[in-house]
């Protein structure tokens, strides 16, 4: 009876899980999954947590040190003429408190700064994961578009090949027109193989970042897609000066190197510790004793003792150890300072390059939009000219290739713009999850990510093209039915 009640519930949960898995993932969801499963980010988080935990380790020598000791000794005097056996027990409690030791305080400061650097490193890795996830996501969408346009180009050339074959069969065109069309069709077939492979690789790259395969992803909604000019480059540089994480990490590393010089110099300073202890001991004897020994050194004893004291130490000369350590730390500081300058130059270059890339992407989008319109008009005019004999099939094929190349370039320019926008935010040090949420507004309907779903294979069509070449005598025997390559009209 219970199984009958549980069965509908289990079925419902299974269907709900399947429904959830079957929904297309958007960019924000993909990143959230990557954030939970990406091993590099989790390793960075563990390193950060370990660095902060190490602060407690560095603080511990400054806190009271309390220790308990105990000892038991049994002695047998088997060759002693007195034949004495003894049992000794002792216990002690020791307390040590550092009163002055600048090197220990400096070590604590160093570890706090090291933990701060590790925290910045973790933030950098977070931004890197955001950028890598978005780049991999848009690379998949770009590869999908490229394969879709290649497939559409193949079908367009297939229609042109069919029409040219029909015109050849009735003697309107020469065989060279058919051969040119077939050559172009074969070229597109090779392009399709490359496009399929690129899509497979892009999907695999996304899997590497997130740990998951996605049968569907939310595609770019071209109607909602908009471009925005970035801020003036000087304003971006000013913001990057204060917020760029690589620059911040380099500054913290320089500060850490400066603190290490002070730590080395502290090797000349004295140390002062407070010590306190309490101990008890008990000794008992057994066995025969000489009369002279009776009541002397062999009496049982029970002793207790308390001690309080100060321990002072001042290093006078250590063979030049401290001076050498100071010089090493100074050299390390010079290296850290040069690394800061390197980071500063790199940030300036990254910000300017990102700024230029965003502007170039915007210009490319506008140019390719017009290019698509012009290419479509050119193709329409060329096809009309070919119909009346003023243009050749080569002109038509070239115009077709130009159109679909322009469409692919426009698609790539859109994705490059989105990626460059994220890169400029990363250069500023402001890239976060909210930026992905904003990009989600430009996404729309789901699209399949498998090559076969994007562009179904057409083996029969490809075989028909290969097996239907007209003979060079122009008698039309190359096509068995004289109706061209198509059994049914393809949609335009």
Predicted ranges, named:
Residues 5, 128-243, 357, 361, ...:
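Periplasmic alpha-helical coiled-coil/stalk elements that build and connect Gram-negative outer-membrane
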């Amino acid at each position: 009876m219970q199984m009958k009640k549980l069965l509908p519930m289990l079925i419902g949960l299974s269907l709900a899980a399947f429904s959830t898995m079957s929904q297309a993932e958007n960019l924000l969801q993909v990143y959230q999954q990557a954030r939970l499963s990406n091993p590099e980010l989790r390793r960075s988080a563990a390193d950060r947590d370990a660095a902060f935990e190490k602060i407690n380790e560095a603080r511990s020598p400054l806190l009271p040190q309390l220790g308990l000791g105990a000892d038991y000794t049994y002695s047998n005097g088997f060759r002693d003429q007195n034949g004495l056996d003894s049992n000794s027990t002792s216990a002690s409690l020791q307390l040590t408190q550092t009163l002055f030791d600048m090197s220990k305080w400096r070590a604590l400061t160093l570890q706090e700064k090291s933990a701060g650097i590790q925290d910045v490193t973790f933030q950098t890795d977070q931004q890197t994961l955001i950028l890598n996830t978005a780049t991999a996501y848009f690379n998949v969408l770009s590869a999908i578009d490229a394969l879709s346009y290649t497939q559409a180009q193949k079908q367009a050339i297939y229609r042109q090949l069919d029409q040219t074959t029909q015109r050849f069969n009735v003697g309107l065109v020469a065989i060279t027109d058919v051969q040119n069309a077939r050559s172009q069709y074969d070229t597109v077939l090779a392009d399709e193989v490359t496009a399929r492979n690129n899509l497979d690789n892009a999907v695999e790259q996304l899997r590497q970042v997130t740990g998951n395969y996605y049968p569907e992803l939310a595609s770019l909604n071209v109607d909602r897609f908009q471009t925005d000019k970035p801020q003036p480059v000087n304003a971006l540089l000013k913001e990057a000066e204060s917020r760029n994480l690589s620059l911040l990490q380099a500054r913290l590393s320089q500060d850490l190197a400066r603190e290490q010089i002070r730590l080395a110099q502290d090797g000349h300073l004295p140390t002062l510790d407070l010590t306190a202890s309490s101990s008890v001991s008990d000794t008992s004897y057994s066995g025969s004793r000489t009369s002279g020994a009776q009541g002397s050194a062999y009496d049982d004893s029970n002793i207790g003792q308390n001690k309080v004291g100060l321990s002072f130490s001042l290093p006078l000369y250590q063979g030049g150890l401290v001076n050498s350590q100071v010089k090493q730390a100074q050299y390390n500081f010079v290296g850290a300072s040069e690394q800061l300058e390197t980071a500063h130059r790199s940030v300036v270059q990254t910000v300017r390059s990102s700024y230029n890339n965003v502007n170039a992407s915007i210009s490319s989008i506008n140019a390719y939009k017009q290019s698509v319109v012009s290419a479509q008009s050119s193709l329409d005019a060329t096809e009309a000219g070919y119909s009346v004999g003023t243009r050749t099939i080569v002109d038509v094929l070239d115009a077709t290739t130009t159109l679909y190349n322009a469409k692919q370039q426009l698609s790539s320019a859109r994705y490059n713009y989105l990626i460059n926008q994220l890169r400029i935010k990363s250069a500023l040090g402001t890239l976060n999850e909210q930026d992905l949420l904003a990009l989600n507004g430009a996404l729309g309907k789901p699209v399949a990510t498998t090559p076969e779903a994007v562009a179904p294979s057409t083996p029969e069509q490809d075989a028909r093209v290969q097996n239907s070449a007209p003979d060079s005598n122009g008698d039309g025997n190359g096509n068995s039915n004289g109706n061209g390559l198509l059994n049914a009209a393809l949609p335009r």
